[in-house]
Amino acid sequence: MRRLAMLIALMSLVGCATSTQPSDKDVQRATEGPTADEIFMSRFLRGYARLPTFDESTAFRIELEQRVSDYLAKHPEVSTSPRASQFTFHRRISVGMTKEEVTLLAGTPYEVTTDEAKMQAAARQFWPSIKVRAKEMWVYPGDWQFYFQDDQLVDITVFGKPPL
């Protein structure tokens, strides 16, 4: 598992080094984003220049499980909602989540902006569709951008990933 993650990270770096000018094809639009584990791994790799140990990964998963359990106890309506499996089992960010749910799974964003020019640059060819509802953008590791209207996640884009 560690070798696979390291291989993926190295291939991403090689891909970045060999690419020329970014094109619209480099941006994808999605209804589902990364998992909490993927965000954790990206943050850890960026912060420590290595992959987490088994113990560090286990500690993260235990803490995440506790946060999710606490959230569900405070918000029982989520347990019976259609997005319950995304939140409780897959731990994957998906359109329709609230800011609190996104933060619970993905942590705090690297950047928060309401600047339309920055959002347009990130969304590229998808901006005409996204701008209708997107009022705020959160930027996360792995070049993920989450677009919000008020408290709800309304769109997701990712830069530089193979087709989802």
Name what the model sees in each region.
Residues 17-164:
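Residues within mature, well-folded domains
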Residues 1-14:
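Sec-dependent bacterial lipoprotein signal peptides
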